[in-house]
């Protein structure tokens, strides 16, 4: 299940308290974000050892700025509290490869 983050404090807490976190930085008005959302949700059900969250770039702008997000969707992988990988764009196969790289 994908959790929607609503504050900087919540984002920081999730990132620091979980070994592997995949973050989808999205916007409600973003067509590609909407297109890949069901696939991201499916991945959260398949790869249950990872935490999947979403951050609305317009609603939680402090996280967006801190993480230097400039395009949507942007997917970031956090391992033990640190950003370790980034994927730009709504590419299902590239997102699956990114997730599988860290799921192993």
UniProtKB/Swiss-Prot annotation:
Record's GO cellular component terms: cytosol
Effect of mutating residue 33 to S: Forms a stable disulfide intermediate with OAT. Fails to increase OAT catalytic activity. Does not stably interact with OAT and fails to increase OAT catalytic activity. Forms a stable disulfide intermediate with SAHH
UniProt keyword list: Cytoplasm, Disulfide bond, Electron transport, Redox-active center, Transport
Top-level taxon of the source organism: Eukaryota
Disulfide bonds: 30-33
Active site: 30, 33
Molecular function terms, GO-annotated: protein-disulfide reductase activity
A Pfam entry, by short name: Thioredoxin
Free-text description of this protein's post-translational modifications in UniProt: The disulfide bond between Cys-30 and Cys-33 acts as a redox-active center and is reduced by thioredoxin reductase TRXR.
Chief place of localization: cytoplasm
InterPro entries from the UniProt entry: Thioredoxin, Thioredoxin-like_sf, Thioredoxin_CS, Thioredoxin_domain
Domain Thioredoxin: 2-104
Annotated site residues (Deprotonates C-terminal active site Cys) in this chain: 24
Localisation per UniProt entry: Cytoplasm
PROSITE patterns to which the protein is assigned, alphabetical: THIOREDOXIN_1, THIOREDOXIN_2
Site (Contributes to redox potential value): 31-32
Listed NCBIfam families: thioredoxin
The protein's role, per its UniProt record: Participates in various redox reactions through the reversible oxidation of its active center dithiol to a disulfide and catalyzes dithiol-disulfide exchange reactions. By modifying the redox status of targeted proteins, induces changes in their structure and activity. Reduces oxidized glutathione (GSSG), thereby acting as a backup for the glutathione redox system. Reduces nitroglutathione (GSNO), a compound involved in the transport of nitric oxide (NO). Also reduces oxidative stress by detoxifying hydrogen peroxide, tert-butyl hydroperoxide and cumene hydroperoxide.
Family of the protein in this entry: Belongs to the thioredoxin family.
UniProt name for this protein: Thioredoxin 1
Species annotation: Plasmodium falciparum (isolate 3D7)
């Amino acid at each position: 299940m994908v959790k929607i983050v609503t504050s900087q404090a919540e984002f920081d807490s999730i990132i620091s308290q979980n070994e592997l976190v995949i973050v989808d930085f999205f916007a409600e008005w973003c067509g590609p974000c909407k297109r890949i959302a069901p696939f991201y949700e499916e991945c959260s059900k398949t790869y249950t050892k990872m935490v999947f969250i979403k951050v609305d770039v317009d609603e939680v702008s402090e996280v967006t700025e801190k993480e230097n997000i400039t395009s949507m969707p942007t997917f970031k992988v956090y391992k033990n509290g640190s950003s370790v990988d980034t994927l730009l764009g709504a590419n299902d196969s590239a997102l699956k490869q990114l997730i599988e790289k860290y799921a192993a």
